[in-house]
Structures are given as C-alpha cells and as structure tokens.
Amino acid sequence: NELGVRTAFIASADQGHAHDPNGPYGYDETSKAFDEYVLDAVKSNNLGKLLELTQDFIERAKPDSFWQMLILHGVLKKTKLRNTLNVYECPTYFGMLVATYE
C-alpha cells in the first residue's frame, strides 16, 4: 500500500440462508442460485458481478454476505490482490465460502 504497511481486511459472512426447509428461514431455491453466482464471481475474481443482482433475488436468498462482499469488491478495485477459493460447503441451512486474497 502507499504507506508501505501490511494490512489485513477480513470480510466474514455466510451465503444464502434458505437451503433447508427445516432451517430457521425455510427453503428457497434462490439460496442455491445465489451461492452458485457468488462462487462464480469469486472464481473469476469479478465481485463486480454482484452489482447486477436484484434486491428481490438477494432478499429471497437471505445471505449475510452481500454487503461485506461489496466492500471487498471496493478493496479489490484499489489493490492488486488475487484470490484463491479455499472451500465452499453447505453443511446446514446456510452456505459457507472461504477465499484468500493475496
């Protein structure tokens, strides 16, 4: 960075929360579609794609991650960081994604 200081930014949030009809938010197929869209955005290093999602789509998917990923998108626009997708799992009613940017 401009100051020559190492900096860390951590965006922590779960993906869609409507993967399981027995979960607290019920089931909506949009959760799976949202998670797949986010996975593609991370894999292609193009979080700007998230700006194309509609409010209805986001609300139906019930993610915690949307705003944090937009902030990360802003950070990535100002840096030359590239990502590594570490893991995506959906072990319960919500999806989880871990990516490292260096």
Feature-to-residue mapping (PLM):
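Active-site beta-strand/loop microenvironment that shapes enzyme catalytic pockets
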Residues: 1-34
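Flexible, D/E/H-enriched segments
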Residues: 21-102
